[in-house]
Structure formats: structure tokens, C-alpha cells
Amino acid sequence: MIMPQSRLDVADNSGAREIMCIRVLNSGIGGKGLTTGGGGNKRYAHVGDIIVASVKDAAPRGAVKAGDVVKAVVVRTSHAIKRADGSTIRFDKNAAVIINNQGEPRGTRVFGPVARELRDRRFMKIVSLAPEVL
């Protein structure tokens, strides 16, 4: 569960290393790209949710710099994810992928496994870039 002030690792090569959640959006990918539903008042973000975040640590020559405000989709959480078949999955750390306003990743690679729930939320580009989908 990600809430404002939570810090997440960045699982792509956009240049950011760590981000801090500022806001959790009511969001998803609709027919015309990213839809945020006006921000909403969700308290927690789970896998597949979109957050607004501030870049806290960044690589020197990356596409994003420290202090930038970006949108990101949560791809891994340390809080267990319950699935319809009764199984649960959890990851060691919280991680996110930085996206643009159309819901596409800003980086060209995704590091580490991502949860299968991203496919249900229609983040197909992130799923295809990931080395493993759990």
C-alpha cells in the first residue's frame, strides 16, 4: 500500500532512482489514453494504480532530474496482493515505472519482475518491456 510520503524505487531507465509519492490518483488507461478522473481521494495505491510523485534521487544524465514532479504506475508492492484464485504475491520493495500523460513509460527498459495485475489495468507496454511477469 502506497500513500503520500511513501518512497519507491524506480524500475526503469528514465534516470530517476527513487521517487516519493505526493498524491494517489483515481486512474486507469481508457480509450483515449490516461484518464485520472480529476484526482480523486483514494488513500492508498496498489499495483496498477497511478500516483503523482517527486523525484528524490536521479542519475546525472537521465531524462528526469531530482525535484521533477512526475506520474508513475506502481508495479511492485511489499504489501501482499490477493488474487482471485486465492493465491497471494508480495515483493521485497515498492517500485514504480515513470509514465507520460498518455500512460506510456518514459524509459525504454523495465527492471525486475512486475505483477500480472498490470495486464488487467491495460499497461501493455510496461508488461511487454518487463523481463518477468508474476
Curated annotation (Swiss-Prot):
SMART domains: Ribosomal_L14 (SM01374). Keywords: Ribonucleoprotein, Ribosomal protein, RNA-binding, rRNA-binding. It comes from the Bacteria. GO terms for cellular component: cytosolic large ribosomal subunit. CDD domains: Ribosomal_uL14 (cd00337). One of its GO terms (molecular function) is structural constituent of ribosome. InterPro entries: Ribosomal_uL14, Ribosomal_uL14_bac-type, Ribosomal_uL14_CS, Ribosomal_uL14_sf. GO terms for biological process: translation. Belongs to the universal ribosomal protein uL14 family. Binds to 23S rRNA. Forms part of two intersubunit bridges in the 70S ribosome. Part of the 50S ribosomal subunit. Forms a cluster with proteins L3 and L19. In the 70S ribosome, L14 and L19 interact and together make contacts with the 16S rRNA in bridges B5 and B8. This is Large ribosomal subunit protein uL14. It comes from Deinococcus deserti (strain DSM 17065 / CIP 109153 / LMG 22923 / VCD115). The lineage of its organism: Bacteria, Thermotogati, Deinococcota, Deinococci, Deinococcales.
